Swiss-Prot record:
Pfam families (UniProt xref): Ribosomal_L28
GO cellular component: ribonucleoprotein complex; ribosome
InterPro entries: Ribosomal_bL28 (IPR026569), Ribosomal_bL28/bL31-like_sf (IPR034704), Ribosomal_bL28_bact-type (IPR001383), Ribosomal_bL28_sf (IPR037147)
RNA-binding as UniProt keyword: no
Gene Ontology biological process: translation
Gene: rpmB
Name of the protein described by the UniProt record: Large ribosomal subunit protein bL28
UniProt organism field: Leptospira biflexa serovar Patoc (strain Patoc 1 / ATCC 23582 / Paris)
PANTHER family membership: 39S RIBOSOMAL PROTEIN L28, MITOCHONDRIAL, LARGE RIBOSOMAL SUBUNIT PROTEIN BL28M
Amino acid sequence: MARTCVVTGKGTTAGNNVSHSHKKNRRIWKVNVITKKIFLEDENRWVRVKISTRALRTLRKKGLKVAIKDHGGDITAITPKKYVGITPKAQPVATA
């Protein structure tokens, strides 16, 4: 999905708008995702990451490794530069 946070995995969700008279209309909620350059200290380089603003606050408070670990993610999912923003399931399998 294009509008998905790499750190938390949050994506677009669907549900109902409920009016005062309890009529239900379908709608979607989009995640506030921005593209941000983050410095990886272990590799001494910058990486572009699609991250939600909520995850960015957590990242600034705790740091990249701790924020990813807290949300059950894997740091290797964002490390390869050409796979930034792609979920681990969608990455091609390396053949040896």
